Amino acid sequence: MMMDEFMDLRPVKYTEHKTVIRKYTKKSSMERKTSVRDSARLVRVSMTDRDATDSSSDEEEFLFPRRRVKRLINEIRVEPSSSSTGDVSASPTKDRKRINVDSTVQKPSVSGQNQKKYRGVRQRPWGKWAAEIRDPEQRRRIWLGTFATAEEAAIVYDNAAIKLRGPDALTNFTVQPEPEPVQEQEQEPESNMSVSISESMDDSQHLSSPTSVLNYQTYVSEEPIDSLIKPVKQEFLEPEQEPISWHLGEGNTNTNDDSFPLDITFLDNYFNESLPDISIFDQPMSPIQPTENDFFNDLMLFDSNAEEYYSSEIKEIGSSFNDLDDSLISDLLLV
């Protein structure tokens, strides 16, 4: 009696252990029309152990050991096989777990699988695109960053590759060289000297006589020559000298006479008198015959040998006059 009361005062530890066993069966033609839940069967076997112990040494630890109670449950689930019903999963609990697991993992988008792969670009599990490049000098990878699209990451990789490896580096996109700015050449103003030289050359080709300098035109046109020649002002022209006319008469004056009022008029009659005709040239001259006692014979004027003498003298006189004329002309040119 005392022993039973003592056993009831001990602390009790209650645990439950459950074991599930699945069995699959093929459904008959009659049972295929029913649903999966109606065709599933459950067999449960339970047993309670009031004096259960984990090990043989549990009773020696304490003076008053605790009481251990175990409940053992065995379940046998009989379900139709998935091949006969065409269902993907037969267990509803297992389907719930699969749905929860699939929802946590993000599957890559279909568009991302078909995208082009770029050099130095890779996709992160959460969908971003990372770019990195290897530095050959430092022998390490350089992180370039993450981007929303693969194209942005590829462009950043291309720029870094050109900086590290030069313009001949392998890139994802063909980089077109920038066109060099064309410098506009400033037109230098033509010097006045060149213009004046060209004008002087043109003038030298079209020079005319001094009488036509005032009427010279520097341009050529299709108009007639008469229209191009403009009248010259009279102040630049020299006044024409009227010819001097002599009014010979007996002292009669006219209104158009240019003579002065104090001119002597008695000379008019003198100039009006006609000279007598000389008749000596009309008569033939008789030859002069020398005589013995003639004085001019001694002068050798009529000697035959005198011709050579006088011709030599005349030549010497002519040469002296020529020298005189040449010296006078040179002196005049120097002045």
UniProtKB/Swiss-Prot annotation:
UniProt key word Nucleus: yes
Major location category of this protein: cytoplasm
Keywords, alphabetical: Activator, Cytokinin signaling pathway, Cytoplasm, DNA-binding, Ethylene signaling pathway, Nucleus, Transcription, Transcription regulation
GO cellular component: cytoplasm; nucleus
InterPro entries tied to this protein: AP2/ERF_dom, AP2/ERF_dom_sf, AP2/ERF_ERF_subfamily, DNA-bd_dom_sf
UniProt-annotated location(s): Cytoplasm; Nucleus
GO process annotations (BP): cytokinin-activated signaling pathway; ethylene-activated signaling pathway; leaf development
Top-level taxon in the UniProt lineage: Eukaryota
Alphabetical list of SUPFAM superfamilies matching this protein: DNA-binding domain
Residue ranges of the region described as Disordered: 78-121, 175-209
Record's compositionally biased regions (Polar residues): 80-92, 101-115
Feature: DNA-binding region: 117-174
PROSITE patterns listed in its UniProt record: AP2_ERF (PS51032)
Keyword Protein biosynthesis: no
GO MF assignments: DNA binding; DNA-binding transcription factor activity
Task performed by this protein: Component of the cytokinin signaling pathway involved in cotyledons, leaves, and embryos development. Probably acts as a transcriptional activator. Binds to the GCC-box pathogenesis-related promoter element. May be involved in the regulation of gene expression by stress factors and by components of stress signal transduction pathways.
Similarity-based family: Belongs to the AP2/ERF transcription factor family. ERF subfamily.
The protein, known as: Ethylene-responsive transcription factor CRF4
Organism: Arabidopsis thaliana
